[in-house]
Amino acid sequence: MCFSPVLEINMQSESNVTVRDDIEDIDTNMYQPLSYPLSFQVSLTGFLMLEIVLGLGSNLTVLVLYCMKSNLISSVSNIITMNLHVLDVIICVGCIPLTIVILLLSLERNTALICCFHEACVSFASVSTAINVFAITLDRYDISVKPANRILTMGRAVMLMTSIWIFSFFSFLIPFIEVNFFSLQSGNAWENKTLLCVSTSEYYTELGMYYHLLVQIPIFFFTVIVMLITYTKILQALNIRIGTRFSTGQKKKARKKKTISLTTHETTDMSQSSGGRNVVFGVRTSVSVIIALRRAVKRHRERRERQKRVFKMSLLIISTFLLCWTPISVLNTTILCLGPSDLLVKLRLCFLVMAYGTTIFHPLLYAFTRQKFQKVLKSKMKKRVVSIVEADPMPNNAVIHNSWIDPKRNKKVTYEDSEIREKCLVPQVVTD
């Protein structure tokens, strides 16, 4: 009888403790902390959505125009470039949305599987982008330095692209191999190993968890070195050719000037001795020589413009790749040396947004700057405008004369021999 009140008190205290624990658990579940600050989430999500819209729209436009025009697909260079645009579409559809999901997740949830998929997508995007840019660099070198004896034939290009996709798929599987995802053991054995995601628990700091970083870093630096060497050789080859052509062109111009002076001197002598026929002959030869000189000057200017254009495009391609992928590669090296932390993981997400910017720059650098692609795009736009004008006719049978659509604008004006002779002789008759 003495122990009954004591037992009742103990039971009441235990019940109170359990009730308080349940209340605390409910409170913590109701107010879960976010993994990142709200401003950080909003800004990065906005940039990622912009990259999805612009990158997906521009890359799909390029692919549709390439597929609509059969002569664009026939070349090796365009096929290799199309491979890069297909990769950018995959990144816009699969990798960038998963990064947005990682940004918006909370800390307390079990996000091991999503983090693993995100790391796999980042590894895939990094490795495949570097390899595709490397392939395009080799193709540019092959065209510029060895145009007659090309190494990249159609069969070799297909083999190269197949090997690129196989290696990219293997880089996608590396994060799953690191966490023993495909092992026959229990499925919960790998869930506690978070992969570079901000978490309340400590990071898994063993080197075996970051083999995918060890793959990304050497491939990036190797691609950068190859790009620098290759584009310098391309510029050297163009300078040598243009320089030799300019020197020979200058010699030819000097010879032509001598011949012009001789012909003019001869024509003056002949004009003094003979009559009007020799005057007409001298004028005709001088006009032909002037036309030849104008053509030579035009070719000289075109070569100079081509040299400047190639130099600018080479600088833009190299600087864009370095600007987008160098920060995240350097940060991956820092993570391998110092280990992961919350600050480094947040910086990595910021640099990943910069790296995804190549999905916007690749169509601008590799497709819209090509003259053949520009011609196809202009022709499609003209046909579209013509179809719109024909679909909506003006009332009262009014005719619209559009100088952009009118084919007479591009019509070349030709003169007969008699007209040229009359135009050349008119000033002489007036002066006489």
Swiss-Prot record:
Bilayer topology: Multi-pass membrane protein
Ranges per topology, Cytoplasmic: 1-45, 107-115, 178-208, 336-348
Name of the protein in question: G-protein coupled receptor 22
Transmembrane portions of the chain: 46-66, 86-106, 116-136, 157-177, 209-229, 315-335, 349-369
UniProt-annotated location(s): Cell membrane
Organs and tissues of expression: Abundant levels detected in the brain. High expression in the heart (at protein level). No detectable expression in other peripheral tissues.
Family annotation (Gene3D superfamilies): Rhodopsin 7-helix transmembrane proteins
